[in-house]
Swiss-Prot record:
Transmembrane segments: none annotated. Binds 2 manganese ions per subunit. It catalyses: Release of any N-terminal amino acid, including proline, that is linked to proline, even from a dipeptide or tripeptide. Its EC number is 3.4.11.9. This is Probable Xaa-Pro aminopeptidase P. Mn(2+) 1 binds at residues 460, 558, 572. It comes from Emericella nidulans (strain FGSC A4 / ATCC 38163 / CBS 112.46 / NRRL 194 / M139) (Aspergillus nidulans).
């Protein structure tokens, strides 16, 4: 279902023959006890919701029902109306899959959310911890639940074609089948309480910030179509549509995108969007180059494209291009595997390589953003230490947003601010809530992960401070994380190197102590777009081996360490890939490195200088000198902030 309005009926069923069974897992064996940390994320009682859902499952002859996190566009962050997984499970993290059988319910999520999920899931649910040895994957758990020829159902608009095929193959081995259920069953349970779809106005993103006209971008895409002899490209990723057409929106919190689809063929561009979202300025911007069509007509039009192609004697072998992240429903509407070529999106690849205008904007917005952060941390220390004020985590986050909002070209936050004191910092994607969050303890570690949206760029920065006297353990852990951050920032590598290959640089010092962190080291960042952007990144994900880093990529460098129930440490800078000069040119190939653009001091009293090498101390002192040089002018009339900045950027030595 697309929002509250279903598309044309989808009745695709994949049936399979019985085969060998997977090992049986005890459903409750993998549940975990709730960790103790000072936040109040009470579990929602899901008993009635699950009972209603199971009744609908019986009516639709479904034995196991899958509820993904994503919307119809496979978005990581979604509009409130698409929060189906949170509604049915009570878990509010951004990543996870809910699986409901007629007798059991499980939630699979990754290491960022283990603590949060354990707290928010009630006793109806089993927590499946991804990547933990001995814990079944979501697919394994589904397959076990479906043994004996049972039927697994999913809304085909919420799962990719690749994921559907992979699950189908696994189910075949256990004698089960997968069906697409066009009417989303969770929506039926949610009923009138489900939030309305967003109706925000779309805005033009001027070329002075985009660096390239949308007509040029479409022309580049058509060259890709020509090279592949493709009938067209059907685009479903919201940030790709926004980037391609130089438009921005407000349909998804913190992500300046708008709910839409787009089809580009060799002769036309069609944008599928609710017309009421388009202002006269946007329509003038698009002009005659883009045809506007109703959002709901995408599936019917996709099917019509397929039918027309079948009748075209000149294009019997041409296929439609579709992102490998597009929905199963869209794939099937275009005729399925025989008529669709699923690829890594050429728009995603192009968007990840920022042009010179975008890179200049990223540098500029990070300086302004750094000024806001510096003023914030100086204010926070003064309030806690000198004034002995009582501030909770939300009070602090609100102050940071206020300071950011004063900066030129500010357009909002890029994600919910993670303002966390003491043990809350160990919850990697902690979200403080007014009334239940903690009072900031000046004698505990304070971790703040935050970011801003600016017309000329997007920021994402984490800093960890201690406003009292840190313990030796805290200082050692912080310094090991800092060494990893410096190691990645300082890397020089040949063209063709992937982020997967560089990940060890951020972890090696922790590994030597038998420590690690359960999240990626770096993710791509959009230019006044989504704060999480593919296809490049730094980490152990297989997809990070597929696309080598290239000049113009903008990514995060964010190693961390988390002591459950005690504290969390993370240092995050945004870095840009650039070509560097080396003494030698082995193989005559280009060599690459990084340029950091985040401008905010790194907490000095948490550093143990004896653990740093001479080159690491030089890096830190050079970095702090750069922060001072680029930001001190903002505080000529602010003595408190200026003195704090002077202290926090002073050179250190062993």
């Amino acid at each position: 279902m697309l929002f509250s309005r279903p598309p044309a009926r989808l009745s695709w069923i994949l049936a399979f023959q019985p085969s060998q069974k997977l090992p049986r897992y005890s459903p409750r064996f993998f549940s975990i006890s709730v960790s103790r940390f000072a936040i109040d994320m009470e579990a929602v009682d899901t008993t009635k919701r699950l009972s209603s859902l199971r009744q609908l499952m019986r009516e639709h002859k479904v034995d196991v029902y899958i509820v993904p996190s994503e919307d119809s566009h496979q978005s990581e962050y979604i509009a409130p109306c698409d929060g189906r997984r949170e509604f049915i499970s009570g878990f509010s993290g951004s990543a996870g899959t809910a699986i409901i059988s007629l007798n059991e319910a499980a939630l699979s999520t990754d290491g960022r959310y283990f603590n949060q999920a354990a707290k928010q899931l009630d006793n109806n649910w089993t927590l499946l911890k991804r990547g933990v040895e001995g814990v079944p994957t979501s697919q394994e758990w589904i397959t076990q639940q479906a043994e004996g020829g049972k039927v697994v159902g999913v809304d085909p608009a919420l799962i990719t074609g690749a994921a559907a095929r992979s699950l189908s193959d696994a189910l075949q081995k256990s004698g089960a089948s997968l069906i697409g259920v066009s009417q989303n069953l969770v929506d039926l349970v949610w009923g009138n309480d489900r939030p309305a779809p967003p109706r925000e106005k779309v805005r033009v993103h001027p070329e002075k910030y985009a660096g390239k006209s949308f007509q040029e971008k479409v022309s580049d895409l058509r060259k890709e179509l020509e090279n592949k002899k493709a009938a067209g490209f059907v685009i479903s990723m919201l940030d790709e549509i926004a980037w391609l057409l130089n438009l921005r929106g407000s349909d998804i919190p913190y992500n300046p995108v708008f709910i839409s689809y787009c089809i580009v063929t060799p002769t036309k561009v069609e944008l599928y969007i609710d017309d009421e979202k388009l202002t006269p300025e946007v329509k003038a911007h698009l002009g005659d180059d883009v045809i506007i069509k109703p959002y709901d007509s995408i599936f019917a039009d996709a099917k019509a494209l397929f039918e027309a192609k079948k009748k075209d004697p000149d294009a019997p072998s041409s296929k439609f291009l579709l992102s490998n992240r597009a929905s199963w429903a869209l794939n099937l509407s275009l005729g399925g595997e025989d008529h669709v070529e699923e690829i890594r999106s050429p728009i995603g690849d192009a968007k990840a390589v920022k042009n010179e205008v975008e890179l200049a904007g990223m540098r500029a917005c990070h300086i302004r953003d750094g000024a806001a952060l510096i003023e914030y941390f100086a204010w926070l220390e003064n309030e806690l230490v000198n004034k002995k004020s009582t501030l909770d985590e939300v009070d602090a986050a609100d102050k940071l947003e206020q300071l950011r909002s004063k900066q030129e070209l500010f357009a909002g936050l890029s994600f919910d601010t993670i303002s966390s004191t003491g043990p809350n910092g160990a919850v990697i994607h902690y979200k403080p809530e007014k009334g239940s969050c903690s009072v900031i303890d000046p004698n505990a570690i304070y971790l703040c992960d935050s970011g801003g949206q600016y017309l000329d760029g997007t920021t994402d920065v984490t800093r960890t401070f201690h406003f009292g006297q840190p313990t030796e353990l805290e200082k050692k852990a912080f310094t090991l994380v800092l060494k990893g951050c410096i190691g990645l920032d300082s890397a020089v590598f040949p063209k063709g190197t992937s982020g997967f290959a560089l990940d060890v640089l951020a972890r090696q010092h922790l590994w030597k102590e038998g420590l690690d962190f359960l999240h990626g080291t770096g993710h791509g960042i959009g230019s006044y777009l989504n704060v999480h952007e593919g296809p490049v990144g730094i980490g152990t994900r297989v997809q990070y081996t597929e696309v080598p880093l290239a000049p113009g990529n903008v990514i995060s460098d964010e190693p961390g360490f988390y002591e459950d129930g005690k504290f969390g440490i993370r240092i995050e800078n945004v870095i840009m890939v650039r070509e560097v000069q080396t003494t030698h040119k082995f193989g005559e190939r280009p060599w690459l490195g990084f340029e950091h653009v985040t401008m905010c001091p790194i907490g000095q009293n948490l550093i143990e200088p004896s653990l740093l090498s001479d080159s690491e101390i030089k890096w830190l002192n050079d970095y702090h000198a750069e922060v001072w040089e680029k930001t001190h002018k903002y505080f000529e009339n602010d003595e408190v902030t200026r003195k704090w900045l002077e202290r926090e950027t002073r050179p250190i030595s062993k």
